[in-house]
């Protein structure tokens, strides 16, 4: 009989459809070269998980979604953060596991997220999983549940 973690992964794998959002200007949120800061809540929200836990979560999302988790960026210096790009408006008003930092725009709040170009010199940021479609992002429920399973923090919906 599978353990609770395996059941969670199986349940999450059954709901891997990415969420579509504003596709008005195709990939205009992606810089042509280097990297730029983008205001969260306009094209996307983001969550960040630092260090080895972030990389484990990215690996988990890659596995759960059969290699199509949505856009994920890794940072190779400092806190070695991993950024998960989600549909705009999807991170606010939800409980996230400890260790997850949300980037969105709410009342009285402005957040900026680094976004690398798809090619060329983008150090210290690199695409773990580049965007494959302008309107596809990481699925919020799958990511929240995967983070909860990784950090051992039960979620209530």
Name these PLM-found stretches.
Residues 1-78, 87-91, 106-113, 118-157:
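Signature for HUH/AEP ssDNA processing cores
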Residues 81:
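Histidine-centered, metal-coordinating catalytic motifs and their short helical/loop contexts
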Residues 90-104:
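Histidine-dependent nucleotide/RNA phosphoesterase domain, centered on the 2H-phosphoesterase fold
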């Amino acid at each position: 009989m599978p353990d609770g973690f395996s059941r969670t992964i199986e349940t999450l794998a059954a709901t891997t459809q990415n969420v579509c959002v504003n596709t008005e200007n195709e990939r205009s949120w992606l810089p042509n070269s280097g990297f730029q800061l983008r205001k969260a809540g306009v094209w996307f929200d983001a969550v960040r998980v630092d260090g080895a836990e972030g990389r484990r979560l990215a690996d988990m999302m890659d596995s759960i979604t059969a290699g199509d988790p949505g856009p994920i960026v890794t940072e190779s210096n400092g806190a070695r953060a991993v950024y998960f790009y989600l549909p705009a408006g999807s991170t606010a008003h939800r409980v996230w596991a400890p260790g997850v930092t949300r980037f969105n725009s709410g009342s009285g709040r402005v957040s900026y997220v680094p976004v690398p170009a798809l090619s060329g010199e983008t150090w210290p940021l690199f695409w773990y999983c580049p965007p494959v479609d302008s309107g596809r992002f990481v699925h919020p429920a799958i990511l929240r549940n995967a983070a909860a399973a990784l950090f051992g923090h039960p979620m209530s919906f």
